[in-house]
Amino acid sequence: RVFRKNIKVWACADRNNTFKESVQETLLGKSTSVGTGMLPMSRGNAPGIVDIVTKPNTGGMVDLIVVKSDMSKQPSIISSRTYEQGVKAFYGAAVDAIWEDEESDSTIHNECLLRTMTTQGIVILTYTPLHGLTPLTLEFKETATLLTEGMD
């Protein structure tokens, strides 16, 4: 999907440490070589990372990533969230894209779906169902069954 405007993104993980070691490294690259992950550093007028703000007392966990795009004059913002912050950390904002890395509980996932409702945004989940058939995993399983039953 291509967004043709500046967007607000949430990148989420279960804990600060998991976020830093997985999501942050995927987006930015290793801490010693920022800009080697999915998002390059901006050079001159080129698209890419223009600013990174870290959370205090987290050993370098990112709070915000400001990304310049060639699609919009305004930058896009990627904010971090963790499930250990609780569902209240997911209240209130209209968000264009949310990446849930590792399984969240159903209340957080449902809140993420609500955050993207007014923007026609997307929610992406990347997880292995290590906790078995949780309500969230069962929801996907039931949806997949309904979709495949109608395909003859």
Regions found by a protein language model. Name each.
Residues 1-152:
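Phosphate/NTP-binding elements of NTP-utilizing enzymes
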